[in-house]
Amino acid sequence: MDHFVDERDLQLLQNDRYTFYVLSRVLGGPCAVIRTDHESLILCHTEHPYPVWLWTPDGLTEAEKERAWQLAQETCPMARGYRYNLKYELAEHFIARAQESGVPARIATNMFAYDCPAPIAPETAAEGSLHLCTEADIDEAAQMIYEFHEAVAADQQDIDRCRIHARRHIEHQGFFFWKNADGETVACCSWHPNAGMGSVGSVYTRPQHRRRHYAQHMVYQVTQMIADKGLTPMLYTDADYAASNACYEKIGYVLQGKLCTISAK
């Protein structure tokens, strides 16, 4: 197994460009662990607290599933707290093998990958407006990122780490607030460009301001901005959040793929 990726790996990921969009993006940056055969298995871990990404083609044999399991346990073992983003057919094998190994596992998150070929303006009005964050907003953006991760109970990190991420987003004009009519920051989201797509993420509305269509209008406007740049808008959602997914579908998002995160129980 090689410790580097090249064009062969990026071409493989084109077959799952929606579900493995994040993997194709993070492979271009610093990674703590990379293993690939450039044909049927790519493993990548960036850093804690993020999950390990495991790409495999569809229709794996049992031997191929076991090979992926063994590689994951050699490099980023579940017993040490690592989580994995992977396809469902591989997740089933991992959960069974984890049980046999004495480290029971579960599906922690079911994820949908959507794209938006034609954004649709929301039918219901919302007060306020979109705000592109600048350097002056870094501290508040960091707080919003912190609240987002706490709300979804995934990839939690301290406020200093959130500030680093906020600064990085803002330097690339990639972080937005929705401000209500009183000028309060009530929601946020980010976006990243990569390989002809623009991924919307960190969509969060503060609890006391929900059910007022803020997120729908915010995501629509950012989605339209991405489309206007000639990119294909896409996003990941928690499959179990039916209300949020319905909101995205109303503004033109179409389900393109599914994957999951598994972790020790």
Where are these regions (language model features)?
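Conserved beta-strand-loop-alpha-helix junction that forms the acyl-donor binding cleft
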Residues: N85-A91, M234-E249, T261-K265
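Residue-level detector of high-confidence beta-strand sites
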Residues: C188, Q256-K258
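Residue-level recognition of the GNAT/N-acetyltransferase active site
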Residues: P57, R206, R210, D238
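Conserved acetyl-CoA-binding loop-helix of GNAT-fold acetyltransferases
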Residues: E62-Q73, T205, R211-A227, N245-K250
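N-terminal charged segments
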Residues: M1-P77, Y88-H93, I159
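Short amphipathic alpha-helix that is part of the acyltransferase structural core
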Residues: M1-F20, I120-Q156
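A conserved beta-strand-loop-helix scaffold within acyl/acetyltransferase catalytic domains
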Residues: Q157-V203
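Acyl-donor-binding surface of acyltransferase catalytic domains
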Residues: H48-Y50, W55-E127, I262
